[in-house]
Amino acid sequence: MAFDDLRSFLQALDDHGQLLKISEEVNAEPDLAAAANATGRIGDGAPALWFDNIRGFTDARVAMNTIGSWQNHAISLGLPPNTPVKKQIDEFIRRWDNFPIAPERRANPAWAQNTVDGDEINLFDILPLFRLNDGDGGFYLDKACVVSRDPLDPDNFGKQNVGIYRMEVKGKRKLGLQPVPMHDIALHLHKAEERGEDLPIAITLGNDPIITLMGATPLKYDQSEYEMAGALRESPYPIATAPLTGFDVPWGSEVILEGVIESRKREIEGPFGEFTGHYSGGRNMTVVRIDKVSYRTRPIFESLYLGMPWTEIDYLMGPATCVPLYQQLKAEFPEVQAVNAMYTHGLLAIISTKKRYGGFARAVGLRAMTTPHGLGYVKMVIMVDEDVDPFNLPQVMWALSSKVNPAGDLVQLPNMSVLELDPGSSPAGITDKLIIDATTPVAPDNRGHYSQPVVDLPETKAWAEKLTAMLAARK
């Protein structure tokens, strides 16, 4: 099932028993964020949360943790809630091959029901804003998709970017936005500022789950998130035209903010509790001026709790990081078998591969660090043999324990790029990177004395299936 908006997704979650509606009156702070934080601490099957009785707000409706469990992630893809994680990733890979699917342009989006312009805009009246962590420097929009275009090639649909970037609400119509240098919006901004121009943007809030997943997926610069969203949902993705910028935005969004990133203007933004589980400090960041707001009557506001993993962002970004990294590596190295980059947005990646010759696994690890995502994120790579499942951590630990000799299997690369939010980088944005080669050496590499590995007996698979069926029959 393809969801055209957030509301139909919430209904599906409710139908599957994966939406908890909190009827009691709650405080915006700390209850909303604390409840979302708690979903990551109660184990498997954490539900989405719905709040509509929030002290101090009139008619506020807030959804949290909508993709914050593997069950919810499966539902977002139209899969049964009990679909195993590896099968969800395999399905993501299968659908990826459908790219591109052209979007469907629709008229009469619900977000056009109400509009506010210019100095009449007051985001504090329109949005039920609250802090997510007690050390945050202000209110944040952290699950919105930001649409921007290449100023030098504005009609190139593929170069129109849809990405998720945190934004601090700093005034009635002013935001602070962090454009990470490795992301497409930073390239768009750089081109605009070289010309002395503001960068027009459209910000979409309360989105369907597929475009949210796409906003967190590191595609190539000229790959369209809308065309990939169509591939992932297996039907054309619905878009509409934003009235001020003329940009393509999701047809089903709850709220559309349009304005500009003001050229060469910077102000202190932050701190903010980040996906790394640490606060990013206050830094000079770009300033956004909002010139037009369009919104549904009684819009649903959605926010994303971030903190020490796992939280919703880890479910959101995990498969969305594994799959493009796998596809980009597989295109150049067919020997690559699987990529697990689910941990902290791929700051650590585990890659299994066959080997053509000695040193081959390290070459794959190096390439992972220079993919579009790897330049800013992949800080450590663990390379394992093709018979090791990178999603099976006991197998990975076995490979590390039995195959790694620190004398020759650690490859340290000094002074490499990483996103500034990496708390271990020094200075911010610069780090050493590490490849751990936990593969069995092959010629001409003759280090170690590896005998033939012990493998499962031929009958093991059949017995595993038989025992699983017997256990299921007892329940």
From Swiss-Prot:
Which cofactors does it use? prenylated FMN; Mn(2+)
Specify which residues bind Mn(2+) according to the UniProt entry for this protein: N161, H183, E225
Which EC number applies?
Answer: 4.1.1.61, 4.1.1.-
Q: Which residues act catalytically here? A: E274
Q: Which domain of life is it from?
A: Bacteria
Gene Ontology MF term list? 3-octaprenyl-4-hydroxybenzoate carboxy-lyase activity; 4-hydroxybenzoate decarboxylase activity; metal ion binding
Catalytic reaction annotation: 4-hydroxybenzoate + H(+) = phenol + CO2; vanillate + H(+) = guaiacol + CO2
Q: Which InterPro entries match?
A: BsdC, PAD_UbiD-like, UbiD, UbiD-like_C, UbiD-like_N, UbiD_Rift_dom
* Pfam families membership: UbiD, UbiD_C, UbiD_N
Free-text remark on how the cofactor is bound: Binds 1 prenylated FMN per subunit.
* Residues that, per the record, bind prenylated FMN: N161, V162, G163, I164, Y165, R166, M182, H183
Family per UniProt? Answer: Belongs to the UbiD family. YclC subfamily.
Query: What is the stated purpose of this protein?
Result: Involved in the non-oxidative decarboxylation and detoxification of phenolic derivatives under both aerobic and anaerobic conditions. Phenolic acid decarboxylase that catalyzes the reversible decarboxylation of 4-hydroxybenzoate and vanillate.
This one is known as Phenolic acid decarboxylase
Source organism (scientific name) = Escherichia coli O157:H7
- What is the gene called? edcC
